[in-house]
């Protein structure tokens, strides 16, 4: 796999997520996929994403940084969304929040086999704290 192939595959994967093309997910995710060290397989991966989109109807994956060193991808994804209810243990309850996810992927046979994800929960906590104090949402953002 060349360095030019991997970014293209990854961008197509993100387009698949944003289109909610769950039947097409198998083109990008390995049947034995692992997420943060736990084997969830393609079906578990799909269930996780479907649940995320159900809980966050306006979820959109925005690539802000993409680095490829085959067979790995490192990406910083940006989100600006309104989760229903509790998100990451926080009572968001439909408020609009912005946060990033730093995520690393390992590809096998041109499909995602391993994912390591870290979400900036502190950014969400700061926004919720500022919102509860009456600050404008723009003041609560920690990053552009």
Locate predicted features.
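C-terminal and inter-domain tail/linker signature
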Residues: 1-144
């Amino acid at each position: 796999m060349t360095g030019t192939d991997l970014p293209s595959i990854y961008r197509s994967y993100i387009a698949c997520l944003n289109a909610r093309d769950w039947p097409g997910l198998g083109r990008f995710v390995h049947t034995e996929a692992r997420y943060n060290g736990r084997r969830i397989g393609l079906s578990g991966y799909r269930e996780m994403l479907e649940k995320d989109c159900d809980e966050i109807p306006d979820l959109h994956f925005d690539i802000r940084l993409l680095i490829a060193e085959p067979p790995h991808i490192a990406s910083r994804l940006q989100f600006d969304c309104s989760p229903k209810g509790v998100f990451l243990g926080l009572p968001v309850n439909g408020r609009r929040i912005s946060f990033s996810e730093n995520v690393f992927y390992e590809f096998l046979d041109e499909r995602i086999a391993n994912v390591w994800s870290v979400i900036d929960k502190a950014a969400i906590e700061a926004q919720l704290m500022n919102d509860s104090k009456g600050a404008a949402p723009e003041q609560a953002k920690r990053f552009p």
